[in-house]
Amino acid sequence: MLGSSSEIKAFYYYNLSANRNHSESQKNLGYCYEFGRGTEKNLEEAFKWYKKSADNGYKEVYDTLGNFYKLGKGTEINLEEAFKWYKKSAENGNNESFQNLALCYDIG
């Protein structure tokens, strides 16, 4: 399902902005792909855009990227990368990442 006409328009403009290297739009485009908002659900595309957003310094996506690596959503499971992104997110004060980082240390 593509969603409502406003979701399709939002996807269109997020896509334009994301392709011009706007990191928040890259995160939003990843969200659209992850949940099928304005486009077909595609976890590989979601991962790609979340990663671009993180690589461009958008701190709010670090924890999400850690989850994708941990669960193998749109990419191979990579616990070392998951830990790295959880740690970066926690260092930036993300409360959810403190929990995820604690679980990494607890489980090993």
Where are these regions (language model features)?
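Short coil/turn and helix-start
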Residues: M1-I8, N19, Y33, R37-K41, ...
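Short, charged/polar low-complexity linear motifs in solvent-exposed/disordered segments
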Residues: N21, L43-E45, E80
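Ser/Thr/Pro-rich low-complexity tandem-repeat tracts
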Residues: S17, S23-S25, S53, S89, ...
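Hydrophobic face of amphipathic alpha-helices that form TPR/SEL1-like repeat modules
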Residues: M1-G3, Q26-F35, T39, Y62-L71, ...
